[in-house]
Curated annotation (Swiss-Prot):
EC code(s) of this entry: 4.1.1.65
Designated name of the protein: Phosphatidylserine decarboxylase proenzyme
InterPro entries for this protein: PS_Dcarbxylase, PSD-A
Marked site (Cleavage (non-hydrolytic)) residue numbers: G189, S190
Source organism of this protein record: Azorhizobium caulinodans (strain ATCC 43989 / DSM 5975 / JCM 20966 / LMG 6465 / NBRC 14845 / NCIMB 13405 / ORS 571)
Keyword Secreted: no
Enzyme class name: lyase
Pfam families per UniProt: PS_Dcarbxylase (PF02666)
Cofactor(s) annotated in UniProt: pyruvate
Molecular function in Gene Ontology: phosphatidylserine decarboxylase activity
Amino acid sequence: MSVLTSIRKSLVPIHREGYPFIAIAVVIAIGLLSVSTFFGMLAVGLAIWTALFFRDPQRVTPLREGLVVAPADGRISQIGLALPPRELGLSEVPLLRISIFMNVFNVHVNRAPVTGRIEKIAYKPGLFLNAELDKASEDNERNGLIIHGPNGVVGVVQIAGLIARRIVSFVHEGETIGAGERFGLIRFGSRVDVYLPVGTRVLVSEGQLTVAGETILADYDAAPTRDIAFRVS
């Protein structure tokens, strides 16, 4: 039993959203292997990639008040001022926006950047432009959240990309969520924007790689203390 437990703990968990896709890929692989080794092995590779895409590893989240953690694995593509999506009703003036681009090899489970109450969730259908383009924030399919935390409101927007065609949300309005806890997933390549008050101290730079729930994007506290607790989730 201890050996099985050790093996189970060593495997990266797969999110349940991926089960149907993995099952389809496995069935296709089995079918192709019976008629063609070459195409069958390609299908096996696709099945493995599909399983890796939906991996959902645990993360260790810093919990000090004032910290804003990355909502997504990926690369910081943009940092600057921008108007948040109109449907969120978050602000009529530009806010600080940090954009994280996720490629098809990143973990695509998204995590809350701060602890707080989910005040609003707003979904908007749209196009599927390259998620790295600035206008993707305005034109693409997206799902936005407003989280009211101890330091005010934070906007988080999941944006579909060229390949991504489905945004999945795990949460509902009125729920309380902790920093680093899972709130959604975007299938097959996408972007996540975080909107913060102007003047918030940014601790990352464009081009930097991020780990959802772990990388500290910003800090509301201008003179932070060194005392930080952590949570694994």
